[in-house]
Amino acid sequence: NFNVIPPVLEGVRLLFGCELNIVDYSGTIDLSERMLKRLSYTVVSLHDLCLKPGTMEDNTFAVLTALKNPYVTILGHPDDGKFPLDYEAVVKAAKDNHRMIELNNTSLTPGGSRIHAYENDRIILPLCASYKVPVIMNSDAHFTTSVGDHARAEALLKELNFPETLI
């Protein structure tokens, strides 16, 4: 309930955000504009519980359209091989729409649910560097012990000599 949360708590300005699901190949997201207006940041993502993985063309069109939404801030884990994407088109759209791309530490966990994430991030990150698209690291912690754990993401950024100015 946004009405009971103060905008500043113990001297810290609070930011509000959520992860949005792309629910169709037209790029529709699953939160009303009324709620989106109250958020500081949003991450838009493809999840196979919300949308059956489609063709590269279908998935890419959905992402490109979602990135045009003025309430979207970040594209979440575009590295999931279950949803093939035209990575160059996606990175260009992120640049054109002033969006960040998430580098998700959990995606890089061996045996995780996202397939070929490491290989796909090795394609996405150089494109981000080339087009000067900022990335944001996220632990994507689903349990307290993983909060703030960016070890795999940091190692990949270092391996690729990714510019710190874009992180």
Explain the meaning of each model-derived region.
Residues N1-L103, K158-E164:
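Extended substrate/RNA-proximal surfaces in nucleic-acid metabolism proteins
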Residues C18, S139-H142, I167:
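Acidic carboxylate-rich catalytic motifs and surrounding loops in phosphoryl-/glycosyl-chemistry enzymes
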Residues N21-V23, L108, T144:
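Short, active-site-adjacent cap segments at secondary-structure transitions
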Residues P84-K92, G111-L127, T144-K158:
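Histidine/acidic-residue-rich catalytic or RNA/ligand-binding cores of hydrolases
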Residues M100-S113:
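His/Asp/Glu-enriched short active-site or ligand-binding loop at hydrolase and phosphoryl-transfer sites
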Residues V133-V147:
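Short acidic/histidine-rich active-site segments
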Residues S146, P163-L166:
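Long, positively charged, glycine-interspersed low-complexity recognition regions
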